[in-house]
């Protein structure tokens, strides 16, 4: 089965959610053959669908089960995650139960953990920090995100 989903898991606040929008748009540009899907709160997902033209699925539709392990995940969750080529996750860590469950369901998928909490030593905007995090693991996506963020800063 060809993996065509790019999943963006986000359960944070609205401001952090909006900061993630250049990531979604960059994925659409860099991987136009893939489906970019936000897994987030229902209304935030609908907003992203309307403004960005991406897909969304409500995080409350069984995705919390990933915190209990892969075996307990409902079929809809397993199917979506198994079809992922790349998974961006805000608020999870490489060594937590959620990540282990995702890796068990989709071992070939590229799992990338992101945070909107900049280290004290980082003096830039959180959007630029997101670019720095992505650069090490997905340079093409990072370059596209960086171009969009730079354009936003130039235009205001």
Go through each PLM region and give its residues.
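Catalytic machinery of carbohydrate-active enzymes
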Residues: 1-156
């Amino acid at each position: 089965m060809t993996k065509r989903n790019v999943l963006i898991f986000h359960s944070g606040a609205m401001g952090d959610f909006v900061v993630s929008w250049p990531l979604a748009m960059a994925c659409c540009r860099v991987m136009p053959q893939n489906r970019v899907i936000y897994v987030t709160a229902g209304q935030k997902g609908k907003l992203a669908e309307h403004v960005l033209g991406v897909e969304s699925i409500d995080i409350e539709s069984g995705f919390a089960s990933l915190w209990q392990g892969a075996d307990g995940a409902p079929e809809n969750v397993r199917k979506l995650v198994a079809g992922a080529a790349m998974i961006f996750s805000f608020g999870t860590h490489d060594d937590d139960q959620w990540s282990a469950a995702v890796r068990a369901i989709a071992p070939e998928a590229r799992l990338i953990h992101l945070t909107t909490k900049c280290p004290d030593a980082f003096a830039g905007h959180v959007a630029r920090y997101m670019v720095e995090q992505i650069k090490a693991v997905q340079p093409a996506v990072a370059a596209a995100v960086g171009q969009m963020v730079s354009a936003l800063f130039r235009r205001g």
